[in-house]
């Protein structure tokens, strides 16, 4: 694994304070550093927990043990630059974020938020995992192990590019036939 890797964590518009609290920990930062990560950007969405371990190399007294930089934000209108910069993405199981990451050919680990009203995210994540597009973490206690295994995994199936033609053909047939 290369050094100076960038981790992007996104929870979309949901509240996923459990995930944010879990990664806001010196041991987790140390774990990431040992895997070759130097940077972590966290999108906290609608959560109420604000990460406390936010730093750059300049204000990090443990700079040889932790990451070079950790920053966070609530929302941005466009996440493309964060997806592009990331070597690895930890994400909630939102379909939009997941599909965007897969279309950009990014390695993604879905962390299922079991506190949401229905388990549609879990169903979606399990389906995408069964197609070998990504890996999932169903329990935060296994997050480090899941990250490690996902980073070691070499082959995922390529996510197919969007093709509007079948839809347009069906729409045309509905309108004109």
Q: Which residue stretches match the model-derived regions?
A:
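Residues at secondary-structure transition points
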Residues: 14, 74-77, 92, 115, ...
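Nucleotide-sugar donor-binding patch of glycosyltransferase catalytic domains
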Residues: 107-139
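Short acidic-hydrophobic, aromatic-tinged amphipathic segments that line or gate anion-handling sites
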Residues: 71-74, 134-143
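Catalytic phosphate/metal-binding cores of nucleic-acid and nucleotide-processing enzymes, i.e., regions
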Residues: 5, 69, 78, 88, ...
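A donor-sugar binding/catalytic signature common to diverse glycosyltransferases
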Residues: 79-118
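C-terminal amphipathic helix plus adjacent low-complexity
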Residues: 42, 150-177
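Donor-nucleotide binding loops and adjacent catalytic segments primarily
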Residues: 2-85
